[in-house]
């Protein structure tokens, strides 16, 4: 008798995606982050749904409703902090996932990579709008500053900003539409994830060696289900420790003050996961130039496959490229630190140097180093 999981119309899709999927036998724990991101998305949708039951998207009551969730709703505080810190976990996994793709040459799977970039932009947009919802000081001023950047677009900029705001400043209309978008986007992300997986399963996964795995495959279950489960345990442990011991570690104290359009916080800054892009934005004195650099800091990922000059796919056996990759990692950490500092000497200068280095490494240095390695290997 044929197994039901192989014949049932719904089950056979699940079976071919998560059970009998032929996977390379040598993929390391760096390949866990896809499933961890799926887990993060599930946590965010579930906690977000429960928060939406008690939240009111109105400027007069938004801040109070979040306070009400934390104080009066059964286990409301844990749901709220799981959602806030879950976002941090989401981005941590995202950055590691993208870094893995760059290191091991997974960007050669161009459709999967490009859908991934669209996913990254969508998740960033969702997180930004979510940060506005508690209607604290940093929520309000963050929304004002970031949406105002669109006014740098020639000719249509000002009209575009007022159209997004739904008025002449960030107000009730802005909050209402941000809540609507913040609610719908995770479901769009879920659909994009399915497309991401669809394209991935067309080609099969890459592996640490960057070589073809066609001759050496093992079933996804039980080998990688168990391996992913271990990663999930570590993720949940980290998230639980963060939520139960220091839930406000990654937040901003200013957001515990209700939004006040008449009082600007001393340092307007986004959540930690946007700081690297914020530092690049601030390091350019021109407004339009800063906005373009901000967009390009993420969009540059799309041209990495074009810039690939190495004959070897993975960086595993390319020590010079490895050094450049870890310099890039250190540079991103430096930009993250700078983004959280005030706009004064020496932080401005450090930010400008780090921004130039970021673009130079990806556009010029890494492709050149790959060519040198080709010569050294006589390829």
From Swiss-Prot:
GO terms for biological process: mitochondrial electron transport, ubiquinol to cytochrome c. It is a multi-pass membrane protein. The keyword Mitochondrion applies. Heme b b562 binds at residues 83, 182. A ubiquinone binds at residue 201. InterPro entries: Cyt_b/b6_C, Cyt_b/b6_C_sf, Cyt_b/b6_N, Cytb/b6-like_sf, Cytochrome_b, Cytochrome_b_C_euk/bac, Cytochrome_b_N_euk/bac, Di-haem_cyt_TM. Gene3D superfamilies: Cytochrome Bc1 Complex, Chain C. PROSITE patterns: CYTB_CTER (PS51003), CYTB_NTER (PS51002). Its cofactor is heme b. Heme b b566 binds at residues 97, 196. The keyword rRNA processing does not apply. GO terms for cellular component: mitochondrial inner membrane; respiratory chain complex III. The chain crosses the membrane at residues 33-53, 77-98, 113-133, 178-198, 226-246, 288-308, 320-340, 347-367. SUPFAM superfamilies: a domain/subunit of cytochrome bc1 complex (Ubiquinol-cytochrome c reductase), Transmembrane di-heme cytochromes. Its main location: mitochondrion. Keywords: Electron transport, Heme, Iron, Membrane, Metal-binding, Mitochondrion, Mitochondrion inner membrane, Respiratory chain, Transmembrane, Transmembrane helix, Transport, Ubiquinone. GO terms for molecular function: metal ion binding; ubiquinol-cytochrome-c reductase activity. Signal peptide: none annotated. It is found in: Mitochondrion inner membrane. Binds 2 heme b groups non-covalently. Belongs to the cytochrome b family. The cytochrome bc1 complex contains 11 subunits: 3 respiratory subunits (MT-CYB, CYC1 and UQCRFS1), 2 core proteins (UQCRC1 and UQCRC2) and 6 low-molecular weight proteins (UQCRH/QCR6, UQCRB/QCR7, UQCRQ/QCR8, UQCR10/QCR9, UQCR11/QCR10 and a cleavage product of UQCRFS1). This cytochrome bc1 complex then forms a dimer. Component of the ubiquinol-cytochrome c reductase complex (complex III or cytochrome b-c1 complex) that is part of the mitochondrial respiratory chain. The b-c1 complex mediates electron transfer from ubiquinol to cytochrome c. Contributes to the generation of a proton gradient across the mitochondrial membrane that is then used for ATP synthesis. This is Cytochrome b. It comes from Microcebus rufus.
